[in-house]
């Protein structure tokens, strides 16, 4: 992909998610988000979970006792290991299929577009981007909008997108 390094992606299905995108799309979106951020070498795990698992993780790691859409856990090298002692690990992205589905319905967004957004959002968090303050949010959202646009998806932050039920071109879940 234009010489920009992309991660290896491992998909874990810890929950039934019959309306989730297939692994080909999920991997494509992870890699595309990594390219939008300048590229990354290493392994990324994308785990699809139920509300109970994501609620537990959100409670244990963020002190928020509620399910959420996506969590990202960057890999931290254990102390004492020499540089290069392990294959490069980027980290884990956890997505709750039920929350993504519910949010897409509530926000009147095509489900596939919301999935692509959550995958992209999770990758950018994994790579160190956040939206805690306004300046950081602008940087992160700009990357998300650009990456999703290149994939044929509309701006997820546009009020028009939240009112649209139109399916973007080239984005069927199972072509």
From Swiss-Prot:
Ranges of compositional bias, category Polar residues: 159-175
Pfam family, one: YbeY
Segments for region (Disordered): 154-175
InterPro entries: MetalPrtase_cat_dom_sf_prd (IPR023091), YbeY (IPR002036), YbeY_CS (IPR020549)
UniProt cofactor(s): Zn(2+)
Subcellular compartments: Cytoplasm
Superkingdom of the source species: Bacteria
Keywords: Cytoplasm, Endonuclease, Hydrolase, Metal-binding, Nuclease, Ribosome biogenesis, rRNA processing, Zinc
Cofactor stoichiometry and binding remark: Binds 1 zinc ion.
SUPFAM superfamilies: Metalloproteases ('zincins'), catalytic domain
GO molecular function: metalloendopeptidase activity; RNA endonuclease activity; zinc ion binding
GO cellular component: cytoplasm
Protein's GO biological process: rRNA processing
EC class (word): hydrolase
EC id: 3.1.-.-
Residues annotated as binding Zn(2+): 121, 125, 131
PANTHER family hit by this protein: ENDORIBONUCLEASE YBEY, CHLOROPLASTIC (PTHR46986:SF1)
Biological function: Single strand-specific metallo-endoribonuclease involved in late-stage 70S ribosome quality control and in maturation of the 3' terminus of the 16S rRNA.
Protein family according to the UniProt entry: Belongs to the endoribonuclease YbeY family.
Protein name: Endoribonuclease YbeY
Species whose genome carries this gene: Alcanivorax borkumensis (strain ATCC 700651 / DSM 11573 / NCIMB 13689 / SK2)
């Amino acid at each position: 992909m234009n010489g920009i390094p992309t991660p290896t992606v491992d998909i874990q299905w810890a929950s039934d998610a019959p309306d989730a995108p297939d692994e080909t799309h999920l991997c494509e979106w992870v890699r595309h988000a990594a390219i939008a951020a300048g590229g990354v070498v290493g392994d990324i795990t994308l785990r699809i979970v139920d509300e109970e698992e994501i609620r537990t993780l959100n409670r244990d790691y963020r002190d928020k006792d509620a399910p959420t859409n996506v969590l990202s856990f960057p890999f931290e090298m254990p102390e004492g290991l020499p540089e290069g002692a392990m294959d490069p690990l980027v980290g884990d992205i956890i997505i709750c299929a039920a929350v993504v589905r519910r949010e897409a319905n509530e926000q009147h967004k095509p489900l596939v577009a919301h999935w692509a957004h959550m995958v992209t959002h999770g990758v950018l968090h994994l790579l160190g981007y956040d939206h805690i303050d306004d300046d950081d949010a602008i940087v992160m959202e700009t990357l998300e909008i650009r990456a999703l646009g290149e994939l044929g998806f509309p701006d997820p932050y546009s009020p028009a997108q939240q009112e649209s039920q139109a399916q973007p071109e080239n984005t069927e879940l199972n072509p």
